[in-house]
Amino acid sequence: VLLEIFTHDGVGTMVVEDKLDDLRPATLDDVGAILQLIEPLEADGTLVPRGRAVVEREVERFTVLEHDGIIYGCVSITPYLSENMVEMACLIVQSEWQGEGEGELLLRHAESRAKTLGATHLFVLTTRTSHWFIKRGFMQGSVSNLPKEKQAQYNRSRNSLVFIKKLK
């Protein structure tokens, strides 16, 4: 009973005025929670370090997953519309929530936003999760397939693989 009362994912019935789960655009108030999600992955080299100033400046690119006021997932998109492409980055779901389809939800949301912006392709750079993206319809590409601006920023020392998905 105590686990149900004192945790965010207890089992039981709760009557609430608003919904407990929410997928929504990030705000400046969310920056601290986003940093908590991304910092461990920056520390182990999975993600490129961004820092608070970058996340604050680019917060409108982020979407967050929230449960009962706790942010447990995020994704970022960066449009390169002159080349009809959108980059998806920082797709993160807190470990306790993994395996529940939340990553898929964030991916579908990023795809939908990219299509709304007029993009025909979504791309990611990854050093560790190739299998996840391949399973979801991404094809391996090369640096030369990236938008010119992104090619100029590409850090070859990270050896990130490029994966691209054609949006339908």
Locations of the language-model features?
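Active-site beta-strand termini and strand-to-loop segments that position acidic
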Residues: 66-68, 165-167
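C-terminal catalytic "cap/lid" subdomain
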Residues: 1-49, 53-54, 97
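Conserved beta-strand in the GNAT
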Residues: 64, 70-79, 85-92
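A generic "binding-loop/recognition-motif" signal
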Residues: 128-129
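Conserved catalytic-core motifs of GNAT/GCN5-like acyltransferases
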Residues: 123-125, 134, 139-162
